[in-house]
Amino acid sequence: MILHAQAKHGKPGLPWLVFLHGFSGDCHEWQEVGEAFADYSRLYVYLPGHGGSAAISVDGFDDVTDLLRKTLVSYNILNFWLVGYSLGGRVAMMAACQGMPGLCGVVVEGGHPGLQNAEQRAERQRSDRQWAQRFRTEPLTAVFADWYQQPVFASLNDDQRRELVALRSNNNGATLAAMLEATSLAVQPDLRANLSARTFAFYYLCGERDSKFRALAAELAADCHVIPRAGHNAHRENPAGVIASLAQILRF
């Protein structure tokens, strides 16, 4: 079994750019950024429980990493960068720390490196279970209307929220709930030590208005790019800023 994805081919000899969307996103989420790098082959992946991969269920990050490895092999991708937002960033960090043959580097936008104590994990587990129950039982428009009121999305205006609620409500609530629980921060290990000891290139992007993730970025041994005029979802709010940072990263 492999993950559903869309492949766009560039020039031979350059590494692939493998894009991983956030929770409730889809393989189109990164395309405005990705299409600015037409020389590179690009793979836009649907994570389990989402879009073309909605029928794929996982028990945890190990399963996601295994599926991602098999997906890259199926496309004969031998050298690549992982570029992930939020949940996709956490998947990228986990996969990189577990080992991905052919990995050139990781670019994470607004991805959490992991909670640091049992109390935080227990609190997050309670919260994610409550959200998962709502995703399973309530209309998605109502759930996402509340989802985008969370503090991390404070930089969004009302029009941006309405647009995201409409877009995300095309998902399957039951499969989203299953993925939310399987990849909860409550079950993700703290990756700070692994990332400090890494053997791969690691870059972190965060919006200048995303105070929570700017603070987290400061804890990581990573080259951090702050994206102007953007909050948590920087590649949506300022794609040109993210394109500029990614171009700078790929030039090294």
Curated annotation (Swiss-Prot):
Monomer. Gene3D superfamilies: alpha/beta hydrolase. The gene is menH. InterPro entries: AB_hydrolase_1, AB_hydrolase_fold, SHCHC_synthase_MenH. It catalyses: 5-enolpyruvoyl-6-hydroxy-2-succinyl-cyclohex-3-ene-1-carboxylate = (1R,6R)-6-hydroxy-2-succinyl-cyclohexa-2,4-diene-1-carboxylate + pyruvate. Keywords: Lyase, Menaquinone biosynthesis. It comes from Shigella sonnei (strain Ss046). The lineage of its organism: Bacteria, Pseudomonadati, Pseudomonadota, Gammaproteobacteria, Enterobacterales. Its EC number is 4.2.99.20. This is 2-succinyl-6-hydroxy-2,4-cyclohexadiene-1-carboxylate synthase. GO terms for molecular function: 2-succinyl-6-hydroxy-2,4-cyclohexadiene-1-carboxylate synthase activity. Pathway: Quinol/quinone metabolism; 1,4-dihydroxy-2-naphthoate biosynthesis; 1,4-dihydroxy-2-naphthoate from chorismate: step 3/7; Quinol/quinone metabolism; menaquinone biosynthesis. Belongs to the AB hydrolase superfamily. MenH family. Catalyzes a proton abstraction reaction that results in 2,5-elimination of pyruvate from 2-succinyl-5-enolpyruvyl-6-hydroxy-3-cyclohexene-1-carboxylate (SEPHCHC) and the formation of 2-succinyl-6-hydroxy-2,4-cyclohexadiene-1-carboxylate (SHCHC). GO terms for biological process: menaquinone biosynthetic process.
